[in-house]
């Protein structure tokens, strides 16, 4: 009989919790760019691996940065 593969996906690590970041600052554009796609959309939790609490912090910081003009609403072609 053929053997079956048993491969599970590795759980993604919450970047914010792993680096002990308490406050996600909207002015920290380099951090926020980790959580944005090439098209400028906020990446979901299943892609980034963040917890629900930290995902809310990231989403609010990204939205704030967009309003302040630090991040684009849409990607440039």
Swiss-Prot record:
Report if keyword Secreted is assigned.
no
Q: Which GO terms describe its biological process?
A: translation
Q: Which UniProt keywords apply?
A: Ribonucleoprotein, Ribosomal protein, RNA-binding, rRNA-binding
PROSITE patterns per the record? RIBOSOMAL_S18
Query: Which Pfam family, an example, fits this chain?
Result: Ribosomal_S18
Keyword Ribosomal protein attributed:
yes
Which one of the record's GO molecular function terms can you name? small ribosomal subunit rRNA binding
| GO CC annotations, alphabetized | cytosolic small ribosomal subunit
Family classification: Belongs to the bacterial ribosomal protein bS18 family.
Quaternary structure and interacting proteins, as annotated: Part of the 30S ribosomal subunit. Forms a tight heterodimer with protein bS6.
Q: What does this protein do?
A: Binds as a heterodimer with protein bS6 to the central domain of the 16S rRNA, where it helps stabilize the platform of the 30S subunit.
| Full protein name | Small ribosomal subunit protein bS18
Q: Whose protein is this, by species?
A: Lactobacillus helveticus (strain DPC 4571)
Q: Which gene encodes it?
A: rpsR
